[in-house]
Amino acid sequence: MEPYGKGDGRVRWVTPEWLMENMEDVAIIDCQPNIHDYILEHIPGAVYLNEGLFREPRGKAPAMYIPEGAVELIFQQAGIENRPTVVYTGTGGVKGWGDGLEQTMVAYSLARFGHENILVLNGGLAEWKRAGGELTKVFPEVEESGFSAVTKEDFYIEYPEFKRIKDDEDVLLLDARPAEVYEGQGPWIKPGHIPGAVNLPWADLMDPENRTLLKPEDEILELVNSVGATPDRKIICSCGTGREATNEFLLFRWYLGYPDVRIYEGSFTEWTQIEDNPTVTGPDPR
């Protein structure tokens, strides 16, 4: 199966079988949750890149994206070029920390800063193993690249605009956190969710046995339609810190091909740090 997705092609998905046949034509990024997982086993040729490299504290928000110049340096030092680049994660075999979001975080970070040919390995390392893919403990030699980062400002929405438009009739604000957190059981200074946010837990879109593997498209469409996420609406993806939302941003923008999708990167964490902002508890958006 060829790389698939309905967006502009910046992000697509691939199967293990496709990767096996195209190993010589792609770069590969391993973003397993801990370096020890990569040391234990990785796909041959994969360079390790941790998702935590891309965010830092800013103002009262503890996890915002680092400046363009810093990202450019990371990409260059990791040898990343604007060529077909496969991203995958595993289950955290050594430390047990993995939740599957590592690969959507890194894929989004690549896209956000100008990479134009990102291939997400659907099912991650687990599917690679299931398909009989080769594993190694040998590290590739990394050569510095000349990557030029360009921030894609149309991928995200910042707080002032978010607050101004979030209740517009043509806007649908999604909250990708688990239902119990959305309803009020999270660790934030205020409980619940942003008023008007509709809960679409990111994990509901994934295979229950492998959270890096998308459910069949018909099941995904049934879920997104059930919350009113139709292509004619402006979709804003949010969660706790902007991490879970990357899964839904990639899915809506490049898997389903929706025309107007952005992430509120500050998400519930930034929202709750502003004293006057209200929150809602329980299962209803308002």
Swiss-Prot record:
Paired cysteines (S-S): none
Looking up SUPFAM superfamilies in the UniProt record yields: Rhodanese/Cell cycle control phosphatase
Q: What is its EC number?
A: 2.8.1.1
Coiled-coil residues? none
Residue intervals of the Rhodanese domain:
22-137, 167-280
Family matches, as PROSITE patterns: RHODANESE_1, RHODANESE_2, RHODANESE_3
Catalysed reaction per UniProt? thiosulfate + hydrogen cyanide = thiocyanate + sulfite + 2 H(+)
**Top-level taxonomic group:** Archaea
> What UniProt keywords apply to this chain's record, in alphabetical order?
Repeat, Transferase
> Any idea which residues are catalytic in this one?
239
The GO molecular function terms of this record are: thiosulfate-cyanide sulfurtransferase activity
Q: Which PANTHER family does this entry report, sorted A to Z?
A: THIOSULFATE SULFURTRANSFERASE
What does the entry's domain section say?
Answer: Contains two rhodanese domains with different primary structures but with near identical secondary structure conformations suggesting a common evolutionary origin. Only the C-terminal rhodanese domain contains the catalytic cysteine residue.
Q: What is this protein called?
A: Putative thiosulfate sulfurtransferase
Organism from which the protein derives = Methanothermobacter thermautotrophicus (strain ATCC 29096 / DSM 1053 / JCM 10044 / NBRC 100330 / Delta H)
